[in-house]
From Swiss-Prot:
Gene name, Swiss-Prot/TrEMBL: WRKY7
GO cellular component, one term: nucleus
Keywords, sorted A to Z: DNA-binding, Nucleus, Transcription, Transcription regulation
Start-end of Low complexity biased regions: 158-176
Organism from which the protein derives: Arabidopsis thaliana (Mouse-ear cress)
Protein name: Probable WRKY transcription factor 7
Amino acid sequence: MTVELMMSSYSGGGGGGDGFPAIAAAAKMEDTALREAASAGIHGVEEFLKLIGQSQQPTEKSQTEITAVTDVAVNSFKKVISLLGRSRTGHARFRRAPASTQTPFKQTPVVEEEVEVEEKKPETSSVLTKQKTEQYHGGGSAFRVYCPTPIHRRPPLSHNNNNNQNQTKNGSSSSSPPMLANGAPSTINFAPSPPVSATNSFMSSHRCDTDSTHMSSGFEFTNPSQLSGSRGKPPLSSASLKRRCNSSPSSRCHCSKKRKSRVKRVIRVPAVSSKMADIPSDEFSWRKYGQKPIKGSPHPRGYYKCSSVRGCPARKHVERALDDAMMLIVTYEGDHNHALVLETTTMNHDKTL
């Protein structure tokens, strides 16, 4: 069945006609050879499958037979492929139609731009731009080609070398700056700055003076009091800008900081009762202002402040001991300054009178 389908598809396209007996005979011979080769190939495949199914334990004899049958089947199919690949001979030939001169769509213009940039001296630096455009010749195009404006590199700002030399020698510029309406000079000069490296930061190279401010970024402000006076604010002093510790900029500032010196004194006293509100009394009066739970203890910690004299900074906190619930740990913080508070109160009272 497979061979008949192959042969019908092969012979249907270009078989012989009644007017050409020689061509028809040649085509018939090719069909016969193709049919025989295809039948031999299919028969070889059937034999190959049969041998593989029979030989459960392959031996040398069975291997030889399988190899021979495989070679026959492969050669038969190669012959079929070669017969099918031959150029067909006969009256059925194809002719190429003449190429159509009209294109079904318009071609968009192709734009090729070649830009060459040459850097020369700062005084004569320029950009050379070359553009090559190929447009479609048939009719005008509805699309406009966008050509960007060439970018010209401008030379750096030129400076007066004589003024720079006079500034280095005399310490001040010889040229008088322009005057404002109030008569105070105020100029801003832009100068090229050296490249800033990773070790030389902007903050480390900043220098602030009362008369002028110079920064490594190339800006020079003359008489900053006039600039800051426009906003109604006084100029910043140099002392306010030098409060930062400059000993080690990479690490933390290790300058001495003032902290509240609190003297703590811890004592253990027996509890008066099992209630937390009952604390042993001493020579001062105390008022509770809060409590805080303690991790690992069922009893909270109470915080008290001295209420003997108003404004006394003395504090204490009371908590029960972990080893003995009938013992209290009292921690005192701060000193009593009742005399100082009384003197201040008396002075204020006298002033009011």
